[in-house]
């Protein structure tokens, strides 16, 4: 996995959800709750080595998580 700057990941995540920062905050929060409860990561990142927020942002930036998918899991 190539290293990317946090700013570029956040920019891509915002783009994927329509540039709505409020929606991104809610989506990251919901996904972090899932990861904290034991959900498997959808990207190749170890939760023991990376912050859950970073994992959630990468999942959103890569298009693996969106609002509909979060709603299904809750």
Swiss-Prot record:
This is DNA-directed RNA polymerase subunit omega. Its EC number is 2.7.7.6. The keyword Phosphoprotein does not apply. Pfam families: RNA_pol_Rpb6 (PF01192). Belongs to the RNA polymerase subunit omega family. One of its GO terms (cellular component) is DNA-directed RNA polymerase complex. GO terms for molecular function: DNA binding; DNA-directed RNA polymerase activity. SUPFAM superfamilies: RPB6/omega subunit-like. Promotes RNA polymerase assembly. Latches the N- and C-terminal regions of the beta' subunit thereby facilitating its interaction with the beta and alpha subunits. InterPro entries: DNA-dir_RNA_pol_omega, Pol_omega/Rpo6/RPB6, RPB6/omega-like_sf. Keywords: DNA-directed RNA polymerase, Nucleotidyltransferase, Transcription, Transferase. GO terms for biological process: DNA-templated transcription. The RNAP catalytic core consists of 2 alpha, 1 beta, 1 beta' and 1 omega subunit. When a sigma factor is associated with the core the holoenzyme is formed, which can initiate transcription. It catalyses: RNA(n) + a ribonucleoside 5'-triphosphate = RNA(n+1) + diphosphate.
